[in-house]
Amino acid sequence: MSPLRARMIEDMTLAGLAEGTRKIYIQAVRRLAAHYRRSPDELSEEEVRRYLLGLRQRGVARGTFKTGQYGLRFLYRHTLGRDWLLFGEKKDRLATAQAAA
């Protein structure tokens, strides 16, 4: 097991993600790495964007696409600490709740 995969599994465990979710997220990362034949930590935001666009264009089921996207978002945001625009902005839940009150 690669150090990156081990770290992601640890991060998902700390985040309290279910075993099934962890497996799906790891599978999404594995598919991305296989597509480019490189470690995901070596990929640019544009490369990940093109990969996701290709999934959409091939007609991957919406649920499959979204869970894969969430898995990649977890990897890049939580494990690698990259806050890419590709995955949208993080919302400050407290500020949102206070603004709604």
Report residues per predicted region.
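Intrinsically disordered, low-complexity and often Lys/Arg-enriched segments
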Residues: 1-2
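N-terminal core-binding DNA-recognition domain of tyrosine recombinases/integrases
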Residues: 6-98
